[in-house]
Amino acid sequence: THIDRCLSCCSCMTTCPSGVNYMHLIDHARNHVEKTFKRPFLDRMIRTLLSNIIPKPMIFKFVVIMSKFVKPFKFLMPINLKSMLELSPNKIQKKTLKFQNLYRVERKKPTARVALLIGCVQRVVSPQINESTIRILTRHGVEVITMPEIECCGSLNHHLGKEDLAHETFKKNIDFWYEEYLKNGLDAIISNTSGCGTTVKDYGFVLRNDPQFKKKAKKISELTKDVTEFFDENLKLNFKKEERHTKKYNIAYHSACSMQHGQKIHNQPINLLKKTGNNILNIPDGHLCCGS
């Protein structure tokens, strides 16, 4: 039970003076528990539903849409299902950018070519994040490809202890990206979801003993960058005049756990926010998890 309560915030890794990689230890423990312990029926059912719904965007979208019709009856459900229903969004965000596999740079030669991981949950619940990422990248001369075949990074099944399913997803993603890297070239694989980025960056470690995939996995992990990391290292961002507010705002920034502890990225997003001309505030205990 105490393993299930771990949120994988990785704060323990930042705090540990010996540099113990607890993320890998917890993942190993979850896999061991999944293989050796028989959970109660309801627990098994919920975990199976999560494993088969969330990583598949079309199924997940259908479930989210249908959940609003089920919410009035949540009082009849077990506490676990009731909590999940309460957290489900009331509506799906509309897309504002026409979806396509390739987003070219207009009127100039691309300065870089990247693949954007559009994710499973994010492409359904918050598609505007991907759209904004594409707009900023192409505006600054970066050609962007999206690969809809890559539905999920595999982290959900990885954290559920379903190692075989997770590794299957890892390998499928690696094959798609590596083929694109060899055929057309990739300067980076961009993640704008820090949890996904942490997992993809760990592909090389997870598959280090796989003779068929270790080389490819290592390369994919090396190519993977958080979007703020890529901006900070490769682009001189030019904010449009209409994006600069005449009034300065005080913005409190809380870094995602998987970003600051999992990927050791903290200053880059703050530097980007400062370039907007606003005042960025550090919040007390910003290293602690929000609980999500």
Task: Name the predicted role of every residue range.
Residues 23-292:
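Iron-sulfur cluster-binding electron-transfer modules in prokaryotic oxidoreductases
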Residues 1, 5-32, 199:
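Iron-sulfur cluster-binding cysteine motifs and their immediate structural context
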